[in-house]
Amino acid sequence: MTTIPAIGILPIDFLTILLLFSFISHSVCVEFAEDAGELDKSNAFRRQVPQWAVGHFMGKRSLSDDTEQATMYSSRFVESTS
């Protein structure tokens, strides 16, 4: 029993193999891109706050908090007597 190579049965040249592998890799890339698009859509519905305002107000305190703290604590600076 002799073995017949697949190249002898199906004459596949280099260009056909290259196109086959590029098609396979492209289909995998499209599948991953679709998954990433679904993740973006699901996160968009959870965010109800405008994103430009989140960074602007981080670390900010209201004016009433500042005045309350000013009356609660004495000044940290030592006055020099000369």
Swiss-Prot record:
Annotated InterPro entries: Bombesin
Residue positions assigned to the propeptide: 28-47, 62-82
Pfam families: Bombesin
Principal subcellular localization: secreted
Record-level GO cellular component terms: extracellular region
GO biological process: defense response; neuropeptide signaling pathway
Subcellular compartments: Secreted
Keyword tags: Amidation, Amphibian defense peptide, Cleavage on pair of basic residues, Secreted, Signal
Keyword Magnesium annotated: no
Entry keyword annotation includes Secreted: yes
Expressed in which tissues: Expressed by the skin glands.
Methionine amide modification, residue list: M58
Signal peptide boundaries: 1-27
Similarity field: Belongs to the bombesin/neuromedin-B/ranatensin family.
Protein name, UniProt field: Ranatensin
